[in-house]
């Protein structure tokens, strides 16, 4: 029995050693960012991927999202927890299934941590804002009101 426990522990340790972090060292200067339209949020929003592949499971993803002035990302959820840091501009972070766009706009440097599957929304005031979003892939967004989903709209 002791041998069985020993070998079980040994296999578990070997498995965890093989599953060690595969993230590579990376330095991404701001002028190296490649901004692209982000089809997952309303028209005008852009994204730049700094690290990782948001389509891959288990991968650490760091991305910046550029939000125009007077902009709303309607209430939505993600299948993952996310950590958002406001880089520039001012934004409001709201919780719930209905947006009211009320409350004080956060200042650069503010951190917003949101658990998986918690409805939230983001809005800007009269200036553009950039947020940095970190999560473990794969990425995903589900709008509370399907009519708000820009991927389902035809222009």
Q: Which residues make up each language-model segment?
A:
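Short acidic-glycine-tyrosine-enriched beta hairpin
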Residues: 55, 68, 91, 96-117
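His/acidic/aromatic-lined binding-pocket segments of jelly-roll/cupin-type domains
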Residues: 65, 75-77, 81-86, 112, ...
């Amino acid at each position: 029995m002791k041998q069985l426990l020993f070998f079980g522990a040994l296999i578990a340790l070997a498995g965890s050693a093989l599953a060690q972090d595969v993230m590579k060292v990376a330095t991404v200067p701001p002028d190296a960012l490649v901004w692209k339209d982000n089809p997952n949020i309303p028209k005008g929003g852009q994204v730049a991927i700094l690290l990782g592949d948001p389509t891959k499971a288990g991968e650490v993803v760091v991305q910046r999202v550029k939000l125009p002035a007077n902009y709303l990302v309607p209430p939505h959820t993600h299948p993952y927890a996310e950590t958002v840091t406001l880089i520039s501009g001012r934004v409001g972070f709201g919780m719930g299934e209905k947006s009211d766009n009320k409350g004080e706009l956060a200042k650069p440097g503010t951190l917003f941590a949101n658990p998986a599957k918690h409805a939230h929304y983001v809005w800007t005031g009269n200036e553009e804002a950039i947020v940095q979003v970190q999560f473990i892939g794969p990425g995903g967004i589900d709008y509370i009101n399907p009519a708000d989903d820009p991927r389902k709209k035809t222009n």
